[in-house]
Amino acid sequence: MAASPLIDSNQLELMYDSQPLWDGATLAVGYKYLHADANDEQVERANHDYVDGQTAMVVLKQQIFDKGVNNTVIQYYGKGSALQGVTFGAADTLNGTVKEGEGWALRNYGTIPVAADWDVSHALNYAAANDVELWNGDKGDASTASVSAKVTYHWSDYTRTYLEMGYFDDKKTVNGTDYDRSGAKYTLAQALSYGRDKPELRVFVSHYDSDRDNWTDASESSFNNGLDNDTWAVGIQANVFW
């Protein structure tokens, strides 16, 4: 189900963070209400009303060993925010196409140092949206599941190698018709950094494959304008912070 365009909103956010639980564990609880406040251009473009949205989350953070961490997140999305979980949209944005619905997401991610020079990172995601109705009249449900893992070897404090793998599977029902797509990504990268943390300069090669033949949007049909189901990418990526 479509998840754009985004519209302006006024927001109220409540957050209680870093509540200690047991050794190395903290809990955060948050709620955000988004009041639709579309500008003139957005109102003209849509020619319909907009509904407010709301999101809530619970985050359990667990420290593992000295430098490892694991995060478990449960999220709820209501009304205009109903599709944000399945589209990996930000909780502070409001989807102007949604009239009704609700969604939820369960996510787990973290990094564990398994040896002096080896780290393993992971991310598990499942999200669903139910009883969704769009302003264009479409009705249905959607879900997404994904898993990814990254193994890092530190050759020194200034250089490291990454091996990353990921897989996703999306499903949706629109007006009684079922659709699905899936895909995978594999990446090998070599990074130079100032110390073991970012910033870093990364040279990478990635292979993507995806099966989107049974999907609704022809513009999203795999690669090379829909002619191929896989592709390669080579590039340079910089991660910096101040």
Predicted regions and their residues:
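Internal, well-ordered domain-core segments that constitute the primary functional module
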Residues: M1-D17
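Residues that flank catalytic or metal-binding motifs in active/ligand-binding sites
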Residues: D8-L12, Q54, Y186, V234
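A broad, low-specificity signal marking well-ordered, structured residues that form hydrophobic/aromatic
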Residues: L14, N70, L188, L201, ...
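Residues in well-ordered beta-strands of folded domains
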Residues: M15-D17, G30, F204, N239
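C-terminal structured domain segments
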Residues: T177-N224
